[in-house]
Design a protein with these regions (language model features):
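Phosphate/nucleotide-binding beta-alpha loop and adjacent structural elements of enzyme active sites
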Residues: 1-248
Length: 248
């Protein structure tokens, strides 16, 4: 039934219209306090984001995190959102306008080791555009089941070279974090922000830990609406959600 309804909406509204409707419904439902059990990290933002915070949302997609970050950091805070996919960026802009989010700057670029043009892809599974799984394509990746597009990539330390404050980074880039974070280290060293990362592979979890630990960062996982300390071994084997890193 769900697939049938989705199919009808896609045919009626088109992909951008469909994403706009779905994201609007999601934001209104979560803003009302529902779905906490399904999305604990999103609701946990209330405990770590303070008024006047400056935040970076890497992999902003259609704005689920940026919307909440914007509301929590307030009029004197700031959110820098990173979303290279034109389709998602368009829906992001719709949501930002609809919810009057005036403290967000959207950069329509990917982040990585070089300033260059890249190819990205979004899986299309059973005719469904899986927008949460968009990623930078490897040279040898089979793209027969992907919707592909060109995007611009920028070096994050250069992009954020002139900011004067940074309190929080959220990153969800489908495995590309190990290519991105080495080129964000100057910014991280300068401000020591709280970092929240979705990391799905064991090697990537280990690599990110080894990158941040020498900077004084400690790793944490979210359990029962609180952060629990993790050892490096815990991090490597962690599969319960996003990882958090912060200095103590």
């Amino acid at each position: 039934m769900e697939k049938f309804v989705r199919s009808i909406l896609l045919k009626t509204l088109g992909l951008e219209g469909y994403l706009a409707v779905v994201s609007d419904a999601y934001l209104r439902v979560t803003n009302a306090g529902f779905l906490k059990a399904k999305y604990p990290e999103l609701f946990f933002l209330k405990k770590i984001i303070e008024p006047n915070f400056v935040c970076i949302d890497i992999g902003a997609n259609v704005g689920y995190y940026s919307t909440n970050l914007s509301r929590l950091c307030g009029a004197n805070g700031k959110v820098y959102a990173i979303e290279p996919v034109p389709l998602f960026a368009n829906v992001f802009k719709r949501n930002a306008h609809k919810f009057a989010l005036n403290n967000i700057t959207l950069y329509q670029t990917a982040l990585g080791a070089e300033n260059k043009n890249i190819e990205m892809g979004t899986p299309v599974i059973d005719g469904v555009f899986r927008h949460g799984l968009t990623h930078v394509l490897d040279n040898d990746e089979n793209n027969s089941q992907l919707a592909t597009f060109e995007a611009e990539m920028k070096i994050p330390d250069e992009l954020f070279a002139n900011i004067s404050k940074l309190d929080f980074i959220k990153c969800d880039v489908e495995g590309y974090e190990v290519h991105l974070f080495p080129h964000l280290l100057n910014t991280i060293k300068k401000f020591k922000p709280i970092i929240q990362i979705e990391i799905s592979s064991t090697p990537n979890r280990n690599e990110i830990y080894n990158l941040l630990a020498p900077l004084g960062y400690h790793a944490f996982g979210l359990k029962n609406d609180d952060l629990i300390a993790l050892t490096q071994t815990d991090v490597i084997n962690y599969t319960l959600g996003d990882l958090y890193f912060k200095t103590i």
